[in-house]
Amino acid sequence: MFSWSYLMGLVMVATATLSLARPSYNIAEDTTLEPEEPPTKYQISQPDVHSALPGESVELRCLLGDAIMVTWTKDGAQLVSNNRTLLIGPYLQIREAAPRDSGLYACGATRPLQSETRYFIVNITDGNSSGDDEDDNDGSEDFTNDNNHKRAPYWTNTEKLEKKLHAVPAANTVKFRCPAGGNPLPSMRWLKNGKEFKQEHRIGGFKVRSQHWSLIMESVVPSDKGNYTCIMENEYGSINHTYHLDVVERSPHPPILQAGLPANTTTKVGGDREFVCKVYSDAQPHIQWRHIELNGSKIGPDGNPYLKVLKAAGGNTTVKEIEVLYVRNVSFEDAGEYTCLAGNSIGISYHSAWLTVLPDEERQLDSSSSEYTEIAIYCVGGFLIACMIGTIMMCHMKGRGKKSDFSSQPAVHKLSKRLPLRRQVTVSADSSSSMNSNTPLVRITTRLLSNTDTHLLAGVSEYELPEDPKWEYPRDKLTLGKPLGEGCFGQVVMAEAVGIDKDRPKDAVTVAVKMLKDDATEKDLSDLVSEMEMMKMIGKHKNIINLLGACTQDGPLYVIVEYASKGNLREYLRTRRPPGMEYSFDIFRIPEEQMTFKDLVSCTYQLARGMEYLASQKCIHRDLAARNVLVTETNVIKIADFGLARDINNIDYYKKTTNGRLPVKWMAPEALFDRVYTLQSDVWSFGVLMWEIFTLGGSPYPGIPVEELFKLLKEGHRMVKPGNCTNELYTMMTDCWRAVPSQRPTFKQLVEDLDRILTQTTNEEYLDLNNPLEPYSPSYPDTRSSCSFGDDSVFSPDPMSMNLAFPNPNTQMAPLKHEATQPA
């Protein structure tokens, strides 16, 4: 009896051992099916090999000398920058690497008439995983089994079966999944084009992941095209699903230009011609049209070619549009050689053609007769104009004779005309809203001019402004210089003002002068006067653009303000980005000044002081942004345009401005949706301005369309922490972006906190080159039409509105090197 019990125990143990070993045996069998990756057509003899573990960073450097253009590809597909992959010229950085980042990387350096390519092999491996199933986080769910009753096979995740057609480039990895369930657990087999799919049917074989119900084929080729059917079956039934695979062949070659194009052509002066250049390229081509002027030689006296770039792909220009070059109203200067230059990541190709210009003989013969015709036309036209002027003057004289009550008045008449100049940017003592105070500032009187008055702006009557002795400046001591730009109400020019500084009565001081344009309207004059009066009332402060004087008498209105030689803050920061961070082919350019972390904190502190002063004067800015902040020669930060009169009821926030920026990106939700402007809405804008500073002039909410931005702001999403920013400063930003205005800090609190941070910051904390900055492209606006909440998201949830903790700093931008020494 004892021997039989002992024998049965051994049988049960052996049976249990076999049942437990069977899954392990299947998995081991799967791993034996993994072939070595065959060499692809992109590989060379000795590529650089880089290995890393998941979650680590990978950096590739491609230094191939002076290159016009450097492009990066992965497995033959061109790469673009995103939140995990950063491309800066010859540098490629992959943050938080995953197994799907493994592959063959290539950098191509393009030069005139030649190109060079360097290759890298990146392996992201984990000892516990093959790397094929990094996105199969729900694999355990696929094996859910109902032990209570038997059941035929069924699909457990129909969403993974929705995409039936898969079109991929050659050399990519393809994975088909058929997650199923059943009791007993169904078996899986695969068919290709209706026949059993075996390892020997494909060079390199394939992988079957039974635990994830998947079929994996690496480095696909055109012969892999076809229908792939998964069959799930057990003793109670079977189900199947079919995928269709289409493999697009990629060809690594420089652009191919159609023979015979562009073609030589001849035309006469004044004619129109076009050159056509047909470009065929698998990779994205870059096309340029160049003109070598006809002067007997391609080389000028300075040793440089007479070369001019006429047209280049960029912005919203398509390849089809750039393939045609139009030369209209041809002159002799247009003669010469025209070259179509096309390049991609593999190399450069070009074709040239000649334009010959001949004199227009018919035009020369007709020139004499046309001159007589023009003279006759001018004479007749002049006579008719003289008759019209005479008739108008006679009617005017008769009308004046009838109105005897005006006959005794002098040549200059004064008509009382009150313009609605209101303090739209001030607030009352009991409210912080900018829409409550409507006190008129100044009374302007129009003046009808006699015939002797000549200095009259087109479209605007000449006005008599009341003289203010405190601010009036002699017009003869002001020397106007070059234009600085156009503002809201007119134009701004540089000038020299003698004696405007009371401490230096004999010295000339460089100032900026605001004046109306030639086509200014009465509203433009009203707005300029309103801004001048507002600046008078606000007074002076170190961190705002101060009013120095005005010329209001005996001539056009000149408003004299301080001059900031280094321009607006946004461009000031962008030109001082570390080498390699700006959008430029020359990544080794030395920035104008080496910025430190303390410089950025000091800039933020000065802005907070300026806004604290404006808030104390009950002034609401309503357009606080880096583009409206100026920098002086001594790097003093000054807030500008705080006195502008804006019609807040008629702004179309859905239209882009002329320079492509959307003002909604700096506006608080209550200002955006309810048109309520308060000091708290300025605090929100200050938080966005801080984000601009610590991204060195980055564009807020990059790639987010306006309609999506409205939705995301309402849902409580906010931008993530910039790379050159500590956790403490980012907390200050998010406090400024509180959904409830009363929960945001005041400018006084911001000044106190920034003063404390500034005193704890050393001068040696230079910006880290490895920290990613927002890409800056002056020609290419963001074109993404949707946002992602994955790695590409630029938002993080608002802790107040979403009841979530702050985003983990370890999963966002890389911190600065000095962050460990700062309070966080």
From Swiss-Prot:
Residues 1-21 form the signal peptide. It catalyses: L-tyrosyl-[protein] + ATP = O-phospho-L-tyrosyl-[protein] + ADP + H(+). It is a single-pass type I membrane protein. Its main location: membrane. Residues 22-374 are extracellular. Autophosphorylated. Binding of FGF family members together with heparan sulfate proteoglycan or heparin promotes receptor dimerization and autophosphorylation on tyrosine residues. Autophosphorylation occurs in trans between the two FGFR molecules present in the dimer. N-glycosylated in the endoplasmic reticulum. The N-glycan chains undergo further maturation to an Endo H-resistant form in the Golgi apparatus. The keyword Zinc does not apply. It is an enzyme of class 2 (transferase). GO terms for molecular function: ATP binding; fibroblast growth factor binding; fibroblast growth factor receptor activity. SMART domains: IG, IGc2, TyrKc. Residues 396-824 are cytoplasmic. The active site is at D623 (proton acceptor). Coiled coil: none annotated. The modification Phosphotyrosine is found at Y463, Y583, Y653, Y654, Y766. It is found in: Cell membrane; Golgi apparatus; Cytoplasmic vesicle. Its EC number is 2.7.10.1. Residues 131-144 have a biased composition (Acidic residues). Residues 160-177 are annotated as: Heparin-binding. Tyrosine-protein kinase that acts as a cell-surface receptor for fibroblast growth factors and plays an essential role in the regulation of cell proliferation, differentiation, migration and apoptosis, and in the regulation of embryonic development. Required for normal embryonic patterning, limb bud development, lung morphogenesis, osteogenesis and skin development. Plays an essential role in the regulation of osteoblast differentiation, proliferation and apoptosis, and is required for normal skeleton development. This is Fibroblast growth factor receptor 2. It comes from Pleurodeles waltl (Iberian ribbed newt).
